[in-house]
């Protein structure tokens, strides 16, 4: 019952503003700034009044946090208005190309156990390989997003890369077809654009 502009965070005073940062993130469009509302009855009931390591947010805020899905995701809460004026957090509206995107809905397959007793994963009638090296793949896509941001990629191009990163980060855990995401989002072309720009 929290709005898209509110956060339940018992460790912070009501009315203060918090930047919510989840790592890795694709850019400032994945950093919502929310106002603390510690009077929300549903949040008090669910989290309690004394929690130091849990906050409550709206599902739309979670979507914006680089695909947080309420399965134990970690978010840093950074107050945005300190008296010394040292903390300045940039935020911008979410990318249109990310609205409503759900990696599990788009890339989760169906498990079948073969005659050999091993699990096989299928999507659209085709078997696909599961991800085994999340850190490596996440490093690749994070570096690409950083490079794209530096060279001034369009919002559409950034959305393609970030959608793929959302699939990659959950691919191993939720058995997602990350290779198909790589094709659908034409990640190879994005890599080529970065190479051409830096050459």
Explain the meaning of each model-derived region.
Residues 1-76, 84-92:
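Core mixed alpha/beta domains of very large multi-subunit molecular machines
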Residues 67-68, 73, 83-85, 93-190:
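Conserved catalytic alpha/beta cores of large enzymes that bind or transform nucleotide phosphates
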Residues 197-198:
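Conserved small/polar residues in nucleotide/adenosyl-binding loops
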């Amino acid at each position: 019952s929290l709005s898209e502009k509110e956060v339940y965070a018992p460790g912070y005073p009501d009315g203060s503003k918090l930047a919510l940062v989840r790592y890795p993130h694709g850019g400032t469009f994945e950093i919502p700034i929310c106002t603390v509302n510690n009077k929300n009855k549903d949040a008090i009931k669910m989290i309690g009044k004394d929690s130091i390591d849990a906050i409550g947010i709206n599902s739309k805020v979670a979507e914006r946090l680089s695909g947080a899905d309420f399965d134990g995701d970690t978010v840093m809460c950074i107050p945005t208005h300190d008296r010394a004026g040292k903390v300045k957090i940039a935020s911008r509206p979410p990318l249109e190309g990310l609205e409503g995107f759900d990696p599990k809905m788009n890339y989760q397959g169906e498990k079948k156990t073969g005659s050999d007793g091993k699990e096989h994963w299928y999507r659209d009638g085709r078997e696909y390989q599961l991800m085994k090296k999340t850190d490596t793949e996440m490093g690749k896509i994070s570096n690409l997003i950083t490079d794209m941001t530096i060279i001034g990629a369009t919002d559409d191009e950034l959305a393609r890369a970030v959608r793929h990163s959302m699939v990659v980060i959950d691919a191993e855990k939720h058995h997602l077809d990350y290779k198909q995401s790589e094709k659908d989002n034409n990640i190879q072309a994005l890599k080529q654009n970065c190479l051409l720009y830096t050459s």
